Each structure stands twice: as C-alpha cells, then as structure tokens.
Amino acid sequence: MPGFLLEVGTEELPASFLGGAIAQWRSRIPQSLAANSLTSESVEVYGTPRRLAVLITGLPSQQPDREEEIKGPPAQAAFKDGQPTPAAVGFAKKQGVELEALEVRPTDKGEFVFIQKKTPGRPVADILTELVPQWIYSLEGKRLMRWGDGDVRFSRPIRWLVALLDEAILPLELVNGSLTVKSDRISYGHRVLHPAPITIQKAGDYVNTLRDGYVTVNAKERTTTIKEQVAATVQKLGGYTEIYPDLLEEVTNLVEWPSPVVGKFEEEFLNLPTEVTTTVMVSHQRYFPVFKTGDHKELLPYFITVSNGDPTKSEVIAVGNERVIRARLADGQFFYKTDLSKSLESYLPQLETVTFQEDLGSLRGKVERIVKVAAQISSQLQLGEGDRQNNQRAALLCKADLVTQMVFEFPELQGIMGQKYAVASGESPEVSTAIVEHYLPRGADDILPQTLTGQVVGLADRLDTLVSIFGLGLIPTGSSDPFALRRAANAVVNITWAANLQINLASLLAQTVAEFAAQYNKDQAPLITALNEFFLQRIRTLLQEEKQIDYDLVNAVLGENDPEYTERALQDLLDVRDRALYLQQIRRDGTLDKIYETVNRSTRLAAQGDLDTQQLDPTSVVRPELFQKPSESDFYDALVKLVPQTQAAQESRNYQLLVAGLVEIAPTVSNFFDGADSVLVIDPDPEIKRNRLNILGLLRNHARVLADFGAIVKNL
C-alpha cells in the first residue's frame, strides 16, 4: 500500500507557529482523509524551523467504489400508462443511466423512482493533489505574512515542496501571483551542517534521509535529545536544572540538530534575586539555569543554551551568548539598585499615570477599589483588627511594583519584585507575601495563595476586574475571553473552596457593582444578573470537571431555573460544594438509591400543590382529622420526627443527619403510596387532596435542604 510524503520547506518558522501547525495537521489530515474515504495505517506529522512535513503510510491506491441509492420523482409523475414521461427521462439523463435502470419502490409518502448508482473510486494521487493545497493554506497562526506577490498568506515564505507517492513525484504547484513552487524530491538539510540539496528517493526514507543531513524532523525526538543533553551537561557542572515545559517546547521548535553549549557569567550577578536571573535566562534568552545541588534554589554562575549551529564552534557560540546575558544582568542589577532607593509605598503616586483599562481609569483607581473590596471581605469573614490591617495594607501596595524599573523591563516579575521591595521597605511578612500571592493562581496548574491576606487580596483584585470589565459590556463569548475573565472567576471559586472562606459572593458582587455603578453611572440590575449567571456557570463547570460530580447532581444543587438554589449557591460557595460532593458520595455507596424513589415521587406529585418550599413543620399545614388511612398518620408522625434532624442538618451543614432521616422514613412513604393502606393522593375531595399534597410537599421540602431531587436521574 502506498506511502505519501509532503514536506513544505520554508524560511525560519516562529517556534510558536510550528507547534500549533503540527497540532493542526495531526488533527485535520486524518479527518480530511476519512472525509474522502481514504484509510491509512499511520499519519506522522513532523516539523522543524525550516519545514513542516507529514508522512502517511498504508494508503489505498484508490478510493473504494461507492454505491448509493438516489431517489427520483414520484412514480405517477415518472410513468404514464407504463411509459416514461419527460420527468423520468430527465432524471435518468441527469444521473447518467439508462431508463431500464429506473426502479419503482414504495415509501411512506407513496411510490417513487429510484436508481442504484455505482461511482468508481478515484485514484489516491488525484485526491491528494486536491487535498494538499487545502492542508497547507488552512493552517492558522498569528501574523501570517504574504510571500511572493500574490494574496496567499503563510507564516513564512515557502521555498520548496516535496511530494512523493512512494517513489513517484506527485505533481503539485503552489501558485502565488507570479511565483510558483513546484513539487519535487529535493529537500535541504541543516543550513550550516549540510547546506547542499538532499534527494529523497522514497517517501518512507524521509526521516533517515534528513537525519543524514543533520536534521531531526521528529519534534518528540528532538525534545528527548535536548533533555538528555542538558541533564548530562549540568551533571558535569556539579549542579542541576529545571526543565521548564514552555522553554523546552520553544527550544525544540528553534533547532533542527540540537547541541548543548555551556556559558558563564560573573559571580557578582548572583547577588541579584534568583527570580531576576532565571527570568533573564529562561524567558528572554532561552537558557537553562544551573542550580547548586541541594534543597534551596541557589544559582551557579553557568547557563546552558541549546545551539542549532556547528557543535565544533561551541566556544564561539558561548562567548556570544555570554556577552548578551552579561548586558542583560547588568541592566537588572541597575534596575534593582535603583528601585531599592525608594520605599514601595512611594511608587503609589506613579500608578496614576498607568491606565488600567480604557474607560476604567488608572491603576491607582483600581487599587483604591481593591482596598474597598478587601475591607468588605474582611468584614464578612469577621476578622480581627490585625488581619484587617494586613489586608488593607497589602491591597494598597499590591500593584505598586508595576511602575518600578525592574517590572517595567521584566513584566513576568510582577508581584515577585513587589514582595522583595516590600520586605526591603520594612513591611510585615504577611503583607509582603500577599503581594506575590494575590496573583496566584497564574495559570490552570498553578498553586493557590496559602496565606489569608494573599487570599483576601487575590479575591478582591479579581472581583474588581470582573465587575469593571463586565461593566464595560466586555463579557466573554464562546471561545473569546481576551481579559481571562473565566480564569479570574474560576480562581475566586477555587480560592474560596481551598481556603474554606465563608464569604457571601452574591453580597460581594452586589456591593462591588453598586460602587462601580455609582462611579461610572451604570445600571446595576443587568450587571448583577450577568455576573451571577457567569459565576453560576463557572461553579457548574468546576464541580463537573474538577470535582468530578455527575451533571445531574450539579443540577440538583444549583437548581435549574430555580432562584432559591441559585441564590443559595452564590451566597455560600462552601455549602454548594459540600452538598454536591455528598450527593456524589451517597450515589457511589448506594444510599441515594434507598431514598430516590420515595423522595422523587413525592417531589413530582407535590408540584401539583401550593405548599411553600420553606415549610418543614407539618403541625401547621397538615390536618390529622382528615386522615382516612393509618399510612397517613404514620407519614405525619415520621415527618414530625424528621423536623429536628433536618433543622440540625441545616445549622451544622451535616447533611448525613438529613439523609439518615430520609432513609428511615422511606418505608413509611412507600407504604403510603403502595402498601396495604395506600391512598389516592389526588382524592376527589379537594380538602383531602390538599392535605395529602401538603404531606408530600413537606417531604420534598426536607429533601430540598440537600438538593432538588427532581433534577436527579435515577440510572445515570
């Protein structure tokens, strides 16, 4: 079975584009083949800074023949007195068949004319000729450029094209204005180590042929090589390094034939904060830092860079890199010394000159709002005076480092430098730590703030951002979320859950919106509604995806179009989490099955009544004198006994007490419905009917303290 090789040779591709392009082809090419009825044994996508390639093995020589049934006009329109009409003749002509091929068959809508049409499969070469340009031109990425004088865009100019179906060249042309790139079997090796053309004889020879030209086309193989080379090199230096995933991916996409190069810098730069030095190396120069072996991250005056040049010239390469990092570290040293010449608080006036967001004023204004929200959170948490003061101070200083020279030059160090400058300014450990922690988590897999002050300021900052951006009408839609508002809301919920902070989110949002609306003359009601709905969706997603709660149980605690549950969730994030987790637990251990039928059946029938959902005590809404069967009295007595258990569960949030009561009452409820003394709930007498619906409504209400059982699916 044939193999197919496509290689698109280019000028140096950006590392960010290459990774995305490889991922797109891995997903799209198999889909494209399947859509054209082409099978394959494997689809391997390769990429280096100068090429993007795909090697497909086990292709058929052609598509399978396709048989299809085509429906034509109604039989009565196609034939008259047994003779074909113009409608039948036209249908046969259009489908390219003789009249004898027409068949009349019955359908639900009467008799119609059909044909069985067989379409021969097309040769795979013809199909690939059509598909390849689509694969190339459909690639997405940032800052695509025109190449040639046509309108075709690609990440970088395309210089050569290899297209082989086994040993044969597949004739292809990429036309862009006056420039045409034709397919051939000629590729190119490493720009320095093997600049001469390389002839690829057969598609399956691609990987090894390019390896002979000092090009490792497999990105995963390059990654492994880099990790092994860096580990071996750092061991010789008597230290260790961290393999930063983003750095490793970027370096992998910058080299075709990796080789490690060791560089040095002056020990005087070790006096800089470690974070500054590693940021220069990792984020700006793409170096791997070298740490002393031990418990603490203490740097050694070395770095490792991965070169794409001639390994025999490593000393020359090292000198060039040393010159660059020396200048960068000298800048950092100057920034650090200059920044420390003033206290962190003295930078606050400069925040007035930095815009937070167009139409939302300056960073100084944002800081003032953060201070107010932090005070509201402190009040809700009923914190002592010391904690309140720490929260206010940290909120005031949390953005001050943004106008320092170090953070202006290295934005990745925001918060980190704020902490260090706060310590140098004599701020307390609680305040200093909170300045760096309030940014946490910085990403999906990052840690959460560990200190109370860091948690409070982090919540306040994000709540202000959410209210402010929503207030401008810039609400996330679909996959578009330029201000990372989903991540901010997720952080609010996750910080609250992880730290078990007893906050009323609905109240905080309302207070923050009120402040914003007064300052910017906005209508509060639609803004609060939008924020509440947004947070409810975030809670729903986090419960399902991070806490692994079944969707129906999430619906049961959040309610579906039930304001009572949605308000309760926003007023107490800990309670909604705990109820969802507990429901999942009793589903797993089988307890939910013991109460599901009785509670769910009661819930459905109770919907026909009008009992207030807050009512728990049967003595004021049930009339025992209307009982006609012992099962009613038994149900009533069981409900009376259940009241203190439910109230205790509400007060302590120990829902095991409630569920234990529901388990105990289940046989009594079953007897009410189906036992020897069962009753007809919908009795002809309206008073008896209402009395029985109230009994069922009471059981529903007790269960509602935990969840809306009407939303729970029995056999999920």
Swiss-Prot record:
One GO CC term on file: cytosol
Catalytic activity: tRNA(Gly) + glycine + ATP = glycyl-tRNA(Gly) + AMP + diphosphate
Localization annotation: Cytoplasm
Annotated keywords: Aminoacyl-tRNA synthetase, ATP-binding, Cytoplasm, Ligase, Nucleotide-binding, Protein biosynthesis
Example GO BP: arginyl-tRNA aminoacylation
The EC number(s) this enzyme carries: 6.1.1.14
Top-tier EC class: ligase
Listed GO MF terms: arginine-tRNA ligase activity; ATP binding; glycine-tRNA ligase activity
Family: Belongs to the class-II aminoacyl-tRNA synthetase family.
PANTHER family: GLYCINE--TRNA LIGASE, CHLOROPLASTIC_MITOCHONDRIAL 2, GLYCYL-TRNA SYNTHETASE
Subunit relationships: Tetramer of two alpha and two beta subunits.
Protein's name according to its UniProt entry: Glycine--tRNA ligase beta subunit
Species the sequence originates in: Nostoc sp. (strain PCC 7120 / SAG 25.82 / UTEX 2576)
Lineage, top ranks: Bacteria, Bacillati, Cyanobacteriota, Cyanophyceae, Nostocales
